[in-house]
Amino acid sequence: MAIEKSADHSTVETVHADSADVAADPRAKSALVSDNVFEHQQTVRQVIFGHPVLIWWSFFFSVSAIGWGFDAQVNGAVLSIPSFRRDFGEQYDGGFVVPAPWLSAFNSISSVGQFFGGFLCSTIADRVGRRLALAVGVAITCGGIFGELFSTARAAFLISKLILGVGLGFYLTIGPLYSSEASYVQYHDLRIMSLTRSQQVSPVVLRGITTAGVNLGIVIGQLLSNAAIRGFGERGDKWAYRGPFAIQFFFVAFLAIGLPFSIESPWYLVRRNKIDEARTALQRLYGADTNIETKLVAIQMTVAQDLAAKESKWSDAVRGTNRVRTLISCGVFVCQHLVGIIFVLGFSSYFFQLAGLPTERSFDLGVGVTACGVVGTIISWTIVNRLGRRIIFNSGMAILSTINLLIGILDVVPTRGASWTQAALTVVWAFFYQVSIGAVAFVLLGETSSPSLRAKTTAVATATQAVFGIVMNIVLPYMVNPDEGNMQGKVGFVFGGLGVIATVLCYLYIPDLKGRTFEEIDLMFDIRVPPRKMGGYVIEH
């Protein structure tokens, strides 16, 4: 590795050695420090306008998250379409309902497919690259969508949802992973998997904003889904539900057309020891004005550290102080389910109809719920670094639990216009959810997890979220379906009560790590500072 001083911010290295050799070179460590200092000095404006190619390809791969959000929302929203209930349901009390067992299966099978699709994707991505792995995911997703469109029996529709879920598992893994790897320290994007790398090296001032943005792609997909339901749902034929399914082909086509022109992840190329190809990829992503060699050294250094970190065991995540860190990382996503995320966002339109609102109005309110979610997500970017993580998350839990209880009370003590009031409270719930725990959960995951165990902790958090999602999707149909529990608004008592318990635990365990470096966070956990006191703890340097 030849090294010489540049006239700008850092040292220039011409890299030819493999990652292990670079990691052992003290000059490489100096280059890494120099590059890190420069990154911390950059502003958001400089990042966005200085690297348009990088921003574009990060956005391109992140379209997969919008596709995931669309499917996640359409799963529950399609139940509000009368023709879907007619074709896949049974007659009940003068109408049609999908039996609760099948309803549970339809809603949960996609999560099962995503669980296995994620593991399959990671294996393929490490062997053949991120671009080809996403291409495989696009092909599988395409097959699942075709199955949804032309299924006429419940079993066939269920299998199609499973296949589609596997493809979406690829989306959940590759899209965010590519975005975080390609941008590496400057721009990070959607979904939990991206936190493994982007949180570890992102500037402190941007860390909260970038990870809070994890919700944006998802809620945009949810908004588009409800808009499609609104546009097609009142048709009397099969295209009332086939139309929203067919719109998913847009995301498939967008990715399929752009993939041949996309740039392979430089992180993958370095891991495969394809240094020259990695250099070319970095040059295309960052442009001629960026010190590419320094970034290449930084990637090689991190890859070498990752290889050393493989010696850690899964059991380390629940040992010593890591136990609390892992519980917090997973607990923030459990809280989302305990306050009713699946019920409010997944079953909102169906719930509105069960509450007695006209079909057309239920579709309008479904769009309103997700539109408020988009606004809430954007607002969260402006407050996450001003108010801090703890106050936003805990206040959100308290507000959401209260709203759930109010929805339940309105069902027990019916008043004139109670149905509309419940619907309005649901819209308000969606707004406060996205402003608070919807966005901040991803920030807390990246900040509280131990750097040496971040990949493992992230995997555990992802699995925990998936398991709770499957459970809720199985249980909820039995709670709300007219031929089963028919609880209607009384479901608010269930999630309100669970939310109150979770809020108490959040008061004890949710930390505020705003503005803290990872070294400071490690120190506070190591000396066992109570999480609720970390925000005001003074560290003597």
Regions inferred by a protein language model and the residue ranges of each:
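Alpha-helical transmembrane bundle of multi-pass membrane proteins
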Residues: A2-G287, A304-H541
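Short, well-structured alpha-helical segments
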Residues: I292-A304
